[in-house]
């Protein structure tokens, strides 16, 4: 299950099928396992505040993810992914890719962090990128 909180109305103006899109991506990430996630669709200002508080970086970022235990947030919810509309629009334009594609990639990236993937070393980075590509290909086939 995916709980979606939207703090910036530009998200719903940009994408009409947001709920279904993210739910399908989460299902592909979980590979049949049951888990609850929360996603916050926000802006640069909010994500910058979180990035400063939790990572010591006073700058906006595209995605943040938080891994929770049951005691921290509630039974069943294992993680939260936070995405910045502003960052994703800028990065999609810079990389000449569709906003929807970049959103899916960054959402998957955040979910994989919650599931234990990381990119602290070259080996971890390769494993995470490979998993992201597998999920994106699967989504394209389901699309």
UniProtKB/Swiss-Prot annotation:
UniProt EC number: 3.1.-.-
Requisite cofactors: Zn(2+)
Binding, Zn(2+): 109, 113, 119
Cellular compartments annotated: Cytoplasm
GO cellular component: cytoplasm
Cofactor binding note from Swiss-Prot or TrEMBL: Binds 1 zinc ion.
The protein's enzyme class: hydrolase
Pfam hit, one: YbeY
Any GO MF annotation of the entry: RNA endonuclease activity
Highest taxon of the lineage: Bacteria
BP terms from Gene Ontology: rRNA processing
Keywords: Cytoplasm, Endonuclease, Hydrolase, Metal-binding, Nuclease, Ribosome biogenesis, rRNA processing, Zinc
Main function: Single strand-specific metallo-endoribonuclease involved in late-stage 70S ribosome quality control and in maturation of the 3' terminus of the 16S rRNA.
PANTHER family registered for this protein in UniProt: ENDORIBONUCLEASE YBEY, CHLOROPLASTIC (PTHR46986:SF1)
Record-given protein name: Endoribonuclease YbeY
Taxonomic source organism: Neorickettsia sennetsu (strain ATCC VR-367 / Miyayama)
